[in-house]
Amino acid sequence: MPTRIAPLAISAFTATSALGHGRGALADALRADRSGLADNDFTRVPLPEVFAEYDCRNNRLAWHGIAADGFLDAARAAIERYGADRVALVVGTSTSAIGATEEGYRALDGDRLPARLRRPVLHTPHSLGLFLEAALGTRGPCLTVATACSSSAKIFAKAERMIRLGTADAAILAGVDTLCDSVLFGFNALELVSSQRCRPFDTARDGISIGEAAGFALVERDGDARAPRLVGYGESSDAYHMSTPHPEGRGARLALADALARAGLEPDDVDYINLHGTATPKNDEVEAAVLADVFSARVRASATKGFTGHTLGAAGILEAAITLLAMEQGFVPATLNSRDAEPAVAAQLAIEREERPIRVALSNSFGFGGSNCTLAFAAGTPH
C-alpha cells in the first residue's frame, strides 16, 4: 500500500467546456440541470499574433480557457513568486494538435505539407505543452501525459511527485482536448457513439457523446488554508484489453484503494464520487459493480458527462473542477439524462441534484485501454 502524502493546495482552477467559459458558467449549468451538448464552434477565438506558429484548434481552446477566472494572472503570479524554473507545467491531452496534422494530410502536395502547415511545434503530442510554456514563460519541468481519458487526472499525480521530490515548488496543470477526425471516426468505428445525449449508468445507455474542454489548476505545497486540497491519488493499468475494461474492475479497484490510502481515508469517509460514467454498456457496468463493492449506500455518486460530453484527455481535470465546485457550493450534481439506474449503483447514484455538504470527494477517470486514475480532494478550512 502507498504511504500517506502531504496535501497540496489547489490555489486556483478553471474550466471551459460546452457549459460555458469559466467556473460561473459551469456552476450555473450544473445547478440548472442544463446540458451543454450541442453543435458548437469556438474557433473564432484567435491566438495573439505573437503565438501564430502554435495556431490550431486545440491551442485556441487552451488560450480561451486559461483566460477565465483570472487563472492566467494567478499562474503568472506563482511564476513571479517561486521563479520560472521552480514552477512545473504538466499537461494532459489525448490528441493534442492532431487536427492540424489531419489537415496537413488532406492538403499534401505530393509528399510535402503546404507551407502554412510546416510547423513542427504542431505535429507533436507536446504541442499543447510547448504553446503553454511559451505563453506563460515557465522554465521548469514541462511534461505531457497522454493516457487517453485519464490524461488530465494523472497530471495531478505527476505534480504531487514533482513537488514532493523537490523538482518544483508549484505546478500549473492543464488538460485540453478538441474534436478531430481521428477521434470521431475511431469511436464511430467501435460503435460507441450515441445518436442522442449520453445517459450514464442508465439501463438503456447506448454510448458516449464527444465533447471538448480546457481545464487548468495551480497546485502548491503551501497556500491559503481555505483552498481545497489534493489529498490522494491512485493510478493503475488493467493490462487487459485495448478498449474494454477488466471485467472484474481490477485496475479501477486498485486506483480507488491507492487514492484512499494516500489520503489516509476509509471508504465511508467519502461524501461524493464523480464517476467516470461514459455511458458505454461495459464501462458503466464495471464501474457500477466496483462502486457497490467498495462503498456503502451513504456515499453519494453521480456522472456528469451528460452535461459536457466525454472530453477525452480533458475529462480528468474538467471533472476535478466539477468536483471542487460541488464541494465549494455544497451540492451533488445530477446524473443528467439518466432515469433508470444500473441496479448495482442505484443506491448511491444521484439521478437528480442533491443539496448536501461535501468535505471529502473522489473523481474517477478510467481511460480507454485500462489506464485508470482516482483523485481524492478535501475541502479547505471554512471561510
Positions of the model-derived regions?
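Flexible, low-complexity linker/loop segments at domain and module junctions
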Residues: 1-10, 265-269, 345-383
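Conserved active-site "lid/cap" helical segment
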Residues: 2-3, 19, 24-100, 255, ...
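Condensing-enzyme catalytic core mediating Claisen C-C bond formation in acyl metabolism
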Residues: 5-17, 23-40, 193, 197-263, ...
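Conserved small-residue
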Residues: 12, 30, 89, 132, ...
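Active-site pocket-shaping loop/turn-to-helix segments
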Residues: 53-72, 115-125, 142-154, 198-215, ...
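Active-site-proximal gating segment of KS-fold condensing enzymes and close homologs
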Residues: 93-143, 283-296
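Active-site-adjacent elements of ketosynthase-type condensing enzymes
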Residues: 100, 178-200, 235-254, 278-290, ...
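Active-site-proximal alpha-helical scaffold in enzymes
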Residues: 125-129, 133-136, 141-175, 210-225, ...
